[in-house]
Amino acid sequence: MIRINYFNENDINMDFWKKFCNKILKTAYNYFNFNYDIELSITFVNDLKAQQINQQYRNHSYIADVTSFPVEMTENEIKAIGFRELGDMFINLNEAKRKAIKYNHDLNSEMGFLFVHGFLHLLGYDHEDSNDEKIMFDLQDQILKLNNLEYIIKFNEDDYLESN
């Protein structure tokens, strides 16, 4: 079973996105066929908070769309508490909307991508080198396709400049 604790630091009702995320991440949980329950937290944040988190913890000043902080646990710790705590994910709906428009994605695909991308980071996947990137992005594609979503990654370096 997957348990998701939601926190909303926006003035926007996020109930739709919570339900959408539950569906997406339940598919991801089933895809990996975990032999234990997992738990994670997702906080919906505004631009200022997303930028502050990115600056404080990653030393980048741009406004992030998703930021993940994994928790590492041993098998003994998982057995002791009965589930695996994955960590915390911060999602910025405003930045997701901007990128959906900029890259001509629908917002469901953009948000689905962010939920899966952040989830994979919580599991320890990364895209720092080309081999790891291929593995992570292939997993993203497979999980999104299971949810009838398609997401074509379009990278624009301007999105990650420090002056944003």
UniProtKB/Swiss-Prot annotation:
**EC number(s) per UniProt?**
3.1.-.-
Which GO molecular function, any one, fits this protein according to its record? Answer: RNA endonuclease activity
Mind telling me what this protein is named? Endoribonuclease YbeY
Q: Which organism is it from?
A: Mycoplasma mycoides subsp. mycoides SC (strain CCUG 32753 / NCTC 10114 / PG1)
Q: Known PANTHER family for this protein?
A: ENDORIBONUCLEASE YBEY, CHLOROPLASTIC
* GO BP: any one term: rRNA processing
- Location of this chain's protein in the cell: Cytoplasm
Superkingdom to which the source organism belongs: Bacteria
State the UniProt keywords alphabetically.
Cytoplasm, Endonuclease, Hydrolase, Metal-binding, Nuclease, Ribosome biogenesis, rRNA processing, Zinc
Q: What class of enzyme is it?
A: hydrolase
Cofactor(s) needed by this chain = Zn(2+)
Summarize where Zn(2+) binds, as residue positions: H117, H121, H127
Which GO CC annotations does the UniProt entry carry?
cytoplasm
In the record, the note on similarity to other proteins reads: Belongs to the endoribonuclease YbeY family.
Q: What does this protein do?
A: Single strand-specific metallo-endoribonuclease involved in late-stage 70S ribosome quality control and in maturation of the 3' terminus of the 16S rRNA.
What does the cofactor field's note say? Binds 1 zinc ion.
Q: Is Hydrolase set as a keyword in this record?
A: yes
Asked if the keyword Nuclease belongs to this entry, the reply reads yes
Primary place of residence?
cytoplasm
